[in-house]
């Protein structure tokens, strides 16, 4: 995160420097630097963002828009001595009207947005750096305290050792709690949202300024005008990086907070139960396989062949065994273990009733 913010600071500072150059061009910086900072040079005039200058070191007052033909700036041409016979009113290279020259104010607007973006990015970097430095100091102090307590505990007796160990545990828990609380990072999403808005506004204003330069000064646009492509590219990169950083923070928060235990098996809490509607596991550790309430294992109570004319009281597919049968998960050979020992009395009574029914049937026949 800090590396990403440092890269953002670097990109924004480069944009800020390049956007500053057209603003301080002629007439603000004129003869002192040889009129080298200009957007265009056409005829006897050199054009900047806030005004123009002539080749004989006469510059207009810094303001938005170039002076029209009736402006007092051109009064030097009315000299009776005829010192400026070749001068006429300033004419833009693209033959555009002077009203369009007021579009150059978007250079200043874009510079203001970029300045705010740079200050906010720098402030966020400093805040995160201070937060990280504050969390490291208590952690180091806690480690040093633990080391000192361990050294002192070795020199004490066994009773003092137990007391010191309990104290160290309490101190370590409290120190870890404070460190964990301090290590909780702040929510920087509002800062990123504001930075994203500023980067978009700065990108759009810089793009509009470049288009206005092309509209006014093509085909005599100087290197300073073409250099404005760099802030456009860098600001688009900054906007994309801010979107990626914001997305990564929201995804990390989603995984760590809302679905912390569902998405991380190593962080499953003991008190949190996982419910599954397809759960087929047994609660006591083994599986139970039964055929209803009865088992057809060792079925010896079916009627004999000699009594085939009698009604079938006990079909062959039903067992007279009335106990619950448990099949172990490790035993798949068909060996059944009866766990109905507590119901022997009821089982015997049931067998007696069956025998009486058989005897009555034989007596009738």
Curated annotation (Swiss-Prot):
It is found in: Cell membrane. Residues 25-107, 219-224 are extracellular. The chain crosses the membrane at residues 4-24, 108-128, 198-218, 225-245. This is pH-response regulator protein palI/RIM9. Belongs to the palI/RIM9 family. Residues 154-181, 327-346 are annotated as: Disordered. Required for the proteolytic cleavage of the transcription factor RIM101 in response to alkaline ambient pH. Residues 1-3, 129-197, 246-365 are cytoplasmic. GO terms for cellular component: cell division site; growing cell tip; plasma membrane. Keywords: Cell membrane, Membrane, Transmembrane, Transmembrane helix. It comes from the Eukaryota. Pfam families: SUR7. PANTHER family: PROTEIN DCV1-RELATED. Residues 154-166 have a biased composition (Low complexity). It is a multi-pass membrane protein.
């Amino acid at each position: 995160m800090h590396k990403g913010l440092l890269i953002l600071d670097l990109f924004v500072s480069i944009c800020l420097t390049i956007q500053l150059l057209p603003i301080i061009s002629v007439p603000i910086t004129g003869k002192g630097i040889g009129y080298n900072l200009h957007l265009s040079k056409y005829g006897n005039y050199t054009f900047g963002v806030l005004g123009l200058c002539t080749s004989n070191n006469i510059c207009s007052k810094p303001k938005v828009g170039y002076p029209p033909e009736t402006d007092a700036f051109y009064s030097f041409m009315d000299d009776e001595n005829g010192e400026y016979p070749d001068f006429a009113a300033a004419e833009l290279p693209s033959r555009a009207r002077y009203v369009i020259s007021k579009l150059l104010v978007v250079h200043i607007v874009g510079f203001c947005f970029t300045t705010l973006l740079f200050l906010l990015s720098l402030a966020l970097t400093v805040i995160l750096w201070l937060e990280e430095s504050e969390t490291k100091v208590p952690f180091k102090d806690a480690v040093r305290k633990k080391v000192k307590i361990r050294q002192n505990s070795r020199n004490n007796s066994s009773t003092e050792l137990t007391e010191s160990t309990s104290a160290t545990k309490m101190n370590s828990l409290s120190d870890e709690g404070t460190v964990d609380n301090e290590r909780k990072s702040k929510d920087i999403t509002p800062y990123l949202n504001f930075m994203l808005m500023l980067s978009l506004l700065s990108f759009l204003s810089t793009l509009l300024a470049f288009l206005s330069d092309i509209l006014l000064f093509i085909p005599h646009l100087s290197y300073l005008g073409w250099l404005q492509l760099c802030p456009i590219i860098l600001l688009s990169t900054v906007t994309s990086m801010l979107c990626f950083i914001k997305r990564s923070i929201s995804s990390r928060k989603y995984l760590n907070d809302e679905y912390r235990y569902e998405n991380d098996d190593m962080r499953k809490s003991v008190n949190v139960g996982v419910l599954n509607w397809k759960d087929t596991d047994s609660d006591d550790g083994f599986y139970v396989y039964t055929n209803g309430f009865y088992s057809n294992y060792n079925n010896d109570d079916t009627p004999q062949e000699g009594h085939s004319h009698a009604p079938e009281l006990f079909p062959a597919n039903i067992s007279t065994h009335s106990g619950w049968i448990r099949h172990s998960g490790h035993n798949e050979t068909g060996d059944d273990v009866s766990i109905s020992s507590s119901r022997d009395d009821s089982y015997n009574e049931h067998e007696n009733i069956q025998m009486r029914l058989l005897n009555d049937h034989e007596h009738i026949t």
